[in-house]
Amino acid sequence: LKAGAALMFLDTSLPHALITHMLEDAEPAAILTRGQANFRDLPTIDVLVLPARSQSRCEPDWLDDPEQCLATLFYTSGTTGMPIGVESCHAGYVNLALTYADYFELMPGMDATTLTSSLGYDGSISEMYSAWVAGCSVVLLTKEQIRAGPDLLPILRDTEATVLFCPPVLLSTMTVSPEIGLPYPLCRYIVPAGEAFP
C-alpha cells in the first residue's frame, strides 16, 4: 500500500474455481508469499526476505491523487454465483477507520478490537484499521477460537478485547440467548454484522 500499489487478500482455503476466477479477473502483478517459491505460475515476492525498510521515501510519481488511488480489491459473493471485484480507495479506508475509532471512542493502551473476518472480506478493514488509527491493538482470533462457542468467552477476557466484531451467529454459539446470556462485562461494544440477527 505504501508503494502505491493495490492489494488483494487471497483466502487460499476457498475452492480452486473461485481462486482461479479472482486471479484471472484481478490480473495481479505479483503474489506476496511467506517462503513459497511460486503460486499458480504467477510471479511471487517472498515477504520473509524483503528489506525491513524501503530505500525510497517519496510517493510514486504516477500517483495523481493518492487519496483516491485504489488501495484494495475485495471479492464479494456476487449474485451471478461468481465473485465480483469491489474496489476500495485510500480515502475510503481512512474515513471508515477514523469514523469507527471516533464512534467507539477507542483509547490507546486501553482498547483492542477483534479480527474475526477473513482478510479477503471488506469487514476486516473496520476491524483492523479502526484500532490502528487510534493506536490500539488488534486481537487476531484463529478459526478454531472463533468456532469455540462458549470457550471463546475466556479468550476474549484474557486478551482484553473491548470491541468484538462478529457475525450474529457467533453470538448464538456462545450462549442460547445472546441478548441476555453473555457475561458482563465482556466487551465495551459487540458489533454484529454481515447477516441478519437470529
Named regions from a protein language model:
Residues 29, 43-54, 93, 113, ...:
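Conserved helix-loop-beta element of the AMP-binding
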Residues 31, 70, 76-79, 113, ...:
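Conserved S/T- and glycine-rich ATP-binding loop of Class I adenylate-forming
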